[in-house]
Amino acid sequence: MRYPWFRLAIFVLGCLFPLWWFYEAAMGLLGPDPGKIMMDRLGLGALVFLLITLSMTPLQRLTGWSGWIVVRRQLGLWCFAYIVLHLVSYLVFILGLDWGQFGVELRKRPYIIVGALGFLGLLALAVTSNRYSQRRLGARWKKLHRLVYVILGLGLLHFLWIVRSDLKEWAIYAGIGGVLLVMRIPPVWRRVPRLMGGRGRAA
């Protein structure tokens, strides 16, 4: 297995945050509504993992280090794990597993539908993020996994709908996502290594 320490570090970090948040909740450190805070943190964590996952290919392109690509799938699966925990937190802490209330919530809060669509997209990517699916799907596999950019848009829209009153934090994540998307435009993508190489030579 290549870069085992890098993989292990990501695994430890991926586990550490939810465990710490659960500890804070158990110790009564998250205020009067710990379930909502847990849900919000897990959702934000999923968005962060998604942005980090999308940054792996540009980082490999810029630095030439293959380790970024090696951990890309692992990061994507952590994003999915966090979004599953986010959904479970919503169902348990917010709805109290009241499935009848879930239908009411869908009608009252459209951002939940947006979030659900993002979850289904991530589910499709997680299920097919293996070599068997790559072989079976062939060229269609890459097309399917381009859905990640649609999922990013859905995640940012979901986040925007929730934090309508304070857009500062949202703007940071949206800006990072925008830069990552612009970098994937073919003319930009082709020029970035040249710019970095030129800068390196100048230095």
Swiss-Prot record:
Record keywords, A-Z: Cell inner membrane, Cell membrane, Electron transport, Flavoprotein, FMN, Heme, Iron, Membrane, Metal-binding, Transmembrane, Transmembrane helix, Transport
Domain of life: Bacteria
Family per record: Belongs to the MsrQ family.
Keyword Electron transport: yes
Described function: Part of the MsrPQ system that repairs oxidized periplasmic proteins containing methionine sulfoxide residues (Met-O), using respiratory chain electrons. Thus protects these proteins from oxidative-stress damage caused by reactive species of oxygen and chlorine generated by the host defense mechanisms. MsrPQ is essential for the maintenance of envelope integrity under bleach stress, rescuing a wide series of structurally unrelated periplasmic proteins from methionine oxidation.
Name by which UniProt lists this protein: Protein-methionine-sulfoxide reductase heme-binding subunit MsrQ
Pfam families noted in UniProt: Ferric_reduct (PF01794)
Coiled-coil spans in chain: none
NCBIfam families to which the protein is assigned, alphabetical: PRK05419.1-2
Membrane-crossing residue ranges in chain numbering: 10-30, 37-57, 75-95, 110-130, 147-167, 169-189
Cofactor field: FMN; heme b
Localization in the cell: Cell inner membrane
Biological process according to GO: protein repair
GO molecular function ontology, one term from the record: heme binding
Cofactor note: Binds 1 FMN per subunit.
Subunit structure, interactors included: Heterodimer of a catalytic subunit (MsrP) and a heme-binding subunit (MsrQ).
CC per GO annotation: plasma membrane
Gene name as annotated: msrQ
InterPro entries for this protein: Fe3_Rdtase_TM_dom (IPR013130), MsrQ-like (IPR022837)
Membrane topology, as annotated: Multi-pass membrane protein
